[in-house]
Amino acid sequence: MQNTCLMIARCLALATVSLAPAVCQAGSDNYNRAVATFDAVVKCYGDERLPLFRETYPFDDQLKVTYLSNEEQADQQKRFSYLWPFSGSLSAVAAIWDARLDPRFGQVLEQQVRPGLEMYFDSVRTPAAYSSYLNTAPASDRFYDDNIWIGLDFTDLYRLTRDPRYLEQAKLVWRFIESGIDNQLGYGIYWCEQKKNGKNTCSNAPGSVYVAKLYLVTGDSSYLRTAVRLYEWTRTNLQDPTDGLYFDNKSLDGTIGRAKFAYNSGQMMQASALLYRLTGEEHYLREARRLAAACYEHFFAAPSQPGRRYRVFTPGNVWFTAIMVRGFIELYGIDYDRRYIDAIQENLDQAWTNGMREENGLFNDDWTGQTRNESKWLLTQFAMAEMYARLALIDAEE
């Protein structure tokens, strides 16, 4: 396994070197930048023995993550990343492979990413699913949203390759997600299997996208019915009527967690666009466009630098931004209105040259390039690779 991981790192490094002249050209190098960013992740976060990644760079053996539901688990497990950041490797590789169909990334998927992902897989508890930490450690919580992101990627990989293994895995993950649906609050998916105290947009919005995509690749109408039901539940329970954006969660006592995150509204934008494609019902398209305008107003800031034409992504969780970008791209596939795609492209072009990206190929969180992070999170890097790859696919199709 050590030789395999090092071989992958060398192959990607060689690919980056061979593409380096193109990377210097602005606006048309999305694929090269995606490859270079993924290569930097392997170099800086990869392990020499196992197909796993560290959570941060530089490595911090005292790190305590803040996104779990269990403080004790956050104290105990530090050597490798948790599932959520690791799963970004699956999203990034799937997007890069989709953009160019380079067989090298099929090899990366099968030789590094999938073997690493299987180290989080828990078949002891039923239904089987991915745990938040390695299956060699004490049993850890299992999050419905973490598993949804993985199931989405396997569904996309099946669409890309028609390899039945990917569809089988996508369906297996969905069975776990279904176990997290009940009639508390009227319907909806919980956030965490072990902490069923509320239902979150981050489970239900991508849950709708996920099951809509399962319908797209299987034709099973039960998936479409579930996609619509999850979508309607989320709109009814978690949408802010004043601006159309989405709150974070609803507790079982009815309390609304009113924080607004880019990925939540972005996933409802993607769900709206997908459901329009699948049903032809105009109200879904109207809602997707409404959300696109609201996201552009709320999650982009007016530019402060001279010469910028478009609004700038607000600082914060870069992966949240990447998930929102999926929604803009889904809508673009319907109406081909470039205004939001051009804004995303300008942000990605600026990020490459304005100091957001450092000499080691890793990115900070500030899209203006003015603030640097001493510790760089794994998922931020995979999110950047994914965004460049998704824009590269648009380049290839035009």
Language-model regions, residue ranges each:
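Bacterial Sec-dependent N-terminal signal peptides
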Residues: 1-28
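Extended ligand-binding groove/face enriched in aromatic
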Residues: 106-217, 221-225
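Amphipathic alpha-helical segments of tetratricopeptide repeats
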Residues: 118, 178-179, 216, 235-236, ...
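The core hydrophobic/aromatic register in alpha-helical repeat solenoids, strongest
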Residues: 93-96, 154-157, 211-214, 272-275, ...
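CBM-like carbohydrate-recognition segments
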Residues: 28-92, 96-145, 199, 283, ...
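Active-site cradle of extracellular carbohydrate-active enzymes
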Residues: 202-207, 211-215, 223-275
